[in-house]
C-alpha cells in the first residue's frame, strides 16, 4: 500500500512548562533539558473522538477520497472515552463511511501496528482503501502532581489514508515482556463479587528502564529492516521516530551516524502523544512540503509492554 493522504488535529489548550511550575516543583530548564519539551496540548473542552474525526477528514481531503470509498477503518488508542463502542465505529459514523471498523491498543506503537495490518489485508485482497487513525489522550491517565510523568505527555490525533501500491517495503513488530515498567491500571466498576482493592492507579513509569528499552529496541528494529532490504541508513531520507523524548531520538541518531536534519521533531510543542505522534509528525512534514515523491522514510516507535515496531516505506 501507499500513503495517499494525511491529517492531524490538536486540542486548543496549550500547557507550557512554566504553567507546570504551579503544580509541582519543576522548571522550564529542568523539563527542556531532560525531554526537549517546551509545551504540550491538553484536552479541556474537546472530546478525543472529535479530534480523531477532524484528523480523519483532513486525511481524506488530502487523499481526495470520499469516505464511502473506504474498505476498512483501523484506529489505535490507549484510552477511549467509551468502553464501547469502538472509536473507529464513532469515526465511521461521523464521516459517513460504510466499511468494517476495528480498534487496537498497541501503546505508542499503535500507528505502525495499523500500517502492518492494513498492508496484510491488502496483500490478501481484502481491502484497497484503508483509513488509519491514531487518537490519544494521555493527559487523562496522569497524576498531575507527579512531575516524572506529567511533564512528558500531550493529547492529539493523526490519520493517514492508504491506497493500492507497493510503497510499504518492510515492517517489524516485537515485544519484550516488562509490563510493570510502564503501566496504568484501569478503574473498574463495583461488582458484588470483586474482592480486589487496588482497582485503579495513575500512570506509572520507570524512566531509566523505558529509556534503555526504547533506544535499544529502535536501533534493533531499524537495523533489522535495513538488513532485510539490503540498504543502509544512508539510503533513508527521513527518520520518523516516536516523539517520546528528544534524548532518545538523539541516541538513535548518534548510533546510526546520520545528520540531525534527517530526524525531524515536533516533541517541543506537542510532547509525547503516544501512538498519535508518528502520524502527527508525518502530517506536518507532508503539509510543509518536506516530503518528496520517492523519498525513503523509516518509522520507529516503542511503548508499554514493552512493545516496539518499525516500518520502511517510500513516499
Residue ranges and their predicted role:
Residues 3-5, 46-106, 225-249, 253-255:
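Conserved beta-ketoacyl condensing-enzyme motif
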Residues 1-45, 146-212, 216, 220, ...:
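Condensing-enzyme catalytic core mediating Claisen C-C bond formation in acyl metabolism
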Residues 283-300, 306-315:
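Catalytic phosphate/nucleotide-handling subdomain of diverse soluble enzymes
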Residues 198-267:
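A contiguous, well-structured pocket-lining segment that forms one wall/lid of small-molecule binding clefts
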Residues 9, 76-82, 108-110, 134-139, ...:
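Acidic, glycine-rich active-site loops and adjacent beta-strand->loop/helix elements
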Residues 127-157:
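Flexible, glycine-rich active-site loops centered on histidine and acidic residues
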Residues 3-5, 31, 59, 70-73, ...:
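Buried hydrophobic positions in well-ordered alpha/beta secondary-structure cores of metabolic enzymes
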Residues 32-34, 38-50, 77-130, 254-281:
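Conserved catalytic cysteine-centered active-site region
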Amino acid at each position: 500500500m501507499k500513503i495517499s493522504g494525511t491529517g492531524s488535529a490538536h486540542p486548543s489548550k496549550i500547557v507550557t512548562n512554566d504553567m507546570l511550575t504551579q503544580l509541582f516543583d519543576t522548571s522550564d530548564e529542568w523539563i527542556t533539558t531532560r525531554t526537549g519539551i517546551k509545551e504540550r496540548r491538553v484536552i479541556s473542552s474537546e472530546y478525543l473522538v472529535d479530534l480523531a474525526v477532524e484528523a480523519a477528514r483532513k486525511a481524506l481531503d488530502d487523499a481526495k477520497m470520499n469516505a464511502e470509498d473506504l474498505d476498512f477503518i483501523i484506529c489505535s488508542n490507549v484510552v477511549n472515552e467509551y468502553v464501547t463502542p469502538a472509536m473507529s465505529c464513532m469515526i465511521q459514523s461521523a464521516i459517513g463511511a460504510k466499511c468494517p471498523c476495528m480498534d487496537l491498543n498497541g501503546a505508542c506503537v499503535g500507528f505502525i501496528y495499523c500500517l502492518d495490518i492494513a498492508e496484510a489485508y491488502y496483500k490478501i485482497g481484502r481491502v484497497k482503501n484503508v483509513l488509519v487513525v491514531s487518537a490519544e489522550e494521555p493527559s487523562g491517565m496522569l497524576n498531575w502532581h507527579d512531575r516524572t510523568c506529567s511533564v512528558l505527555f500531550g493529547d492529539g490525533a493523526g490519520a493517514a489514508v492508504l491506497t493500492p501500491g507497493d510503497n510499504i517495503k518492510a515492517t517489524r513488530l516485537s515485544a519484550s515482556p516488562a509490563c510493570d515498567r510502564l503501566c496504568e491500571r484501569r478503574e473498574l466498576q463495583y461488582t458484588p463479587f470483586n474482592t480486589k482493592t487496588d482497582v485503579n492507579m495513575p500512570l506509572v513509569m520507570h524512566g531509566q528502564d523505558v529509556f534503555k528499552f526504547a533506544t535499544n529496541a529502535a536501533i534493533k528494529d531499524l537495523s533489522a529492516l535495513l538488513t532485510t532490504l539490503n540498504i543502509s541508513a544512508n539510503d533513508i531520507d527521513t527518520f520518523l521516530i516516536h516523539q517520546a523524548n528528544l534524548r532518545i531520538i538523539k541516541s538513535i541518531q548518534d548510533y546510526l551516524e546520520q545528520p540531525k536534519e534527517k530526524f525531524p521533531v515536533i516533541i517541543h510543542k506537542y510532547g509525547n502523544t503516544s501512538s498519535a505522534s508518528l502520524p502527527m509528525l508525518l502530517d506536518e512534514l507532508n503539509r510543509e512540503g518536506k516530503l518528496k515523491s520517492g523519498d525513503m522514510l523509516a518509522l520507529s516507535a516503542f511503548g508499554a509492554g514493552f512493545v516496539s515496531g518499525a516500518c520502511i516505506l517510500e513516499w
